[in-house]
Design a protein with these regions (language model features):
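N-terminal beta-loop-helix "entrance" segment that forms/cooperates
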Residues: 29-56
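Glycine-rich phosphate/diphosphate-binding loop of Rossmann-like nucleotide-binding domains
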Residues: 1, 8-27
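Secondary-structure boundary/capping motif
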Residues: 14-15, 45, 89
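Short, solvent-exposed amphipathic alpha-helical segments in soluble enzyme
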Residues: 19-24, 76-78, 96
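Short amphipathic alpha-helical segments
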Residues: 18, 71-75, 92
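Mid-chain, well-packed structural core segment of small domains
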Residues: 48-52, 56-79
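Fold-independent oxyanion-binding glycine-rich loops
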Residues: 8, 39-40, 62-65, 81-83
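Ser/Thr/Gly-rich flexible loops in soluble cytosolic domains mediating phosphotransfer, phosphorylation
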Residues: 2-4, 78-105
Length: 105
């Protein structure tokens, strides 16, 4: 399964990057291709390419604030959670994404 997403917390420092790391590790551990863009205090990092978005089976938005470029995901299956959930339960979140897509986690 191909997963893309965005992580963005209120302050844009710690939780943004922790959520990114936890999601990427959980996705890779489950055998999925995953790319998470961060939108923090220093701007957008690891910006998703349109090709990655187009090829994605699902989008995970681990966000606590309004994000830039949400319209890029129009027409895609989206799971939106807080950064706290992405940090505390990344494996469950990846399993839920696989369930939504109809694949085995």
């Amino acid at each position: 399964m191909k997963i893309v997403g965005v992580a963005a917390c209120t302050v844009g420092i710690a939780h943004t990057y922790i959520a990114q790391e936890k999601l990427e590790n959980a996705g890779k551990k489950a055998g999925h291709e995953i790319h998470i863009e961060t939108q923090g205090t220093i701007g957008i990092e690891n910006e998703l390419k349109q090709k990655q978005i187009d090829e994605a089976d699902i989008v995970i938005l681990a966000v606590d604030v309004k994000i830039s470029g949400r319209e890029r995901f129009e027409g895609k299956r989206i799971i939106q959670v807080s950064t706290e959930i992405a940090i505390k339960s990344p494996n469950k979140l990846i399993a839920k994404a696989a369930e939504v897509v109809g694949q085995k986690a």
